[in-house]
């Protein structure tokens, strides 16, 4: 990632990397919030809700900030939305975001050995499916 692509905000006690690509589509982007001055307890990968047809990671900056204040790294991922795509694309995007996080988060100061999935509403469904149904992660090893 180039310096121009990396935005760090240190005055608030955390670093923020915006719009990191986790896949080929324009909405395959995530923001990474990392606590400053200490290693994170774990990396929390969060998927927001919005009935799979609305939402953006920027609306959940408050969550990224709150998690870093508590010693966690937060990864908040955008994913493709309806009507541009239909189910199961939402869960497939979540699986891709998790696979990227597992493979790459150490380079961003995170814990690939301690990833916690979290979500709200439709995003909670995405997180739950990754946790209980192995078919979503199977294509990613």
Label each residue range with its predicted role.
Residues 1-38:
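N-terminal cap/lid segment of alpha/beta-hydrolase-fold proteins
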Residues 50, 73, 78-82:
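Short beta-to-alpha linker loops that shape the active-site pocket of alpha/beta-hydrolase fold enzymes
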Residues 58-76:
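Short amphipathic alpha-helix adjacent to the substrate-entry channel of hydrolases
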């Amino acid at each position: 990632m180039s310096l121009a692509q990396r935005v760090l905000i240190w005055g608030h006690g955390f670093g923020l990397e915006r719009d990191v690509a986790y896949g080929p589509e324009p909405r395959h982007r995530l923001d990474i919030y990392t606590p400053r001055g200490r290693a994170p307890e774990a990396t929390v990968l969060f998927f927001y809700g919005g009935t799979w047809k609305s939402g953006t990671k920027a609306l959940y900056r408050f969550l990224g900030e709150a998690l870093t204040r508590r010693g966690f790294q937060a990864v908040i991922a955008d994913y493709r939305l309806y009507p541009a795509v239909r189910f199961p694309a939402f869960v497939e995007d979540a699986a891709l975001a998790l696979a990227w996080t597992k493979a790459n988060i150490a380079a961003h100061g995170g814990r690939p050995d301690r990833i916690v999935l979290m979500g709200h509403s439709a995003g909670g469904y995405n997180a739950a499916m990754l946790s209980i149904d192995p078919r979503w992660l199977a294509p990613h090893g």
